[in-house]
A protein has these predicted regions:
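DNA polymerase processivity clamps
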Residues: 1-48, 63-177
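Glycine-rich, pocket-lining loop/helix-strand segments that form or immediately flank
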Residues: 51
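Bateman (tandem CBS) regulatory domains
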Residues: 58-62
Length: 177
């Protein structure tokens, strides 16, 4: 009781696949491992040593720039723009009062551009993100809309659902020239 442990995300992802339809989960904590039993399935994983990083210090206290966009439209647009982008190519989000432009520029290939309807409050801003990390956050977000809150192009952005206040995804931008 009162014990705090760090469980690898891969183990938790595997566990969620087994939990469908299970009424009871048993957790057993060892000094260096944790076992989860659900029905006739047991998953054992090594625990991560150390303390969870103090992420609260990274969360900006004010967010002068707020973008609200359809979750499905953003997912589809990011996937289309990402098709042209190479593995390390960031996707730029250009946020204006006219909406949202997604842009990926890849040397030798060209650029992909997608315009989306969005509501934006704040100063015009372009922020670049690793498209895989941005997609991962949006894919697990519940609700029909995505709210992206930013301070500037270099500070962490918050990705949230306006309908589900308990979800928060902290995303670091990528520096682009």
């Amino acid at each position: 009781e009162g014990q705090s442990v760090l469980v690898p995300s891969r183990a938790l992802n595997d566990l969620t696949k087994v939990l469908a339809g299970v009424d009871q989960l048993t957790l057993r904590l060892g000094e260096r491992d944790a076992s989860f039993e659900a029905g006739d399935v047991r998953l054992t994983t090594m625990l991560i040593e150390g303390e969870f990083p103090n992420y609260k210090g990274l969360i900006p206290t004010s967010h002068p720039n707020r973008l609200t966009v359809s979750r499905e439209a953003l997912l589809e647009g990011l996937r289309r723009v990402k098709l042209l982008a190479r593995e390390a190519t960031p996707v730029r989000l250009a946020m204006t009062s006219d909406g949202l432009d997604l842009v990926a520029v890849t040397q030798d290939v060209g650029q992909a551009h997608e315009s989306l309807d969005a509501k934006y409050e704040g100063t015009e801003l372009t922020v670049a993100f690793n498209p895989d990390y941005l997609l991962q956050g949006i894919e697990v977000l519940a609700g029909d809309e995505v709210l992206i809150e930013t301070v500037d192009a270099l500070k962490p952005a918050l990705v949230r659902s306006p309908e589900h206040a308990d979800f928060l995804y902290l995303l670091m931008p990528v520096r682009v020239s």
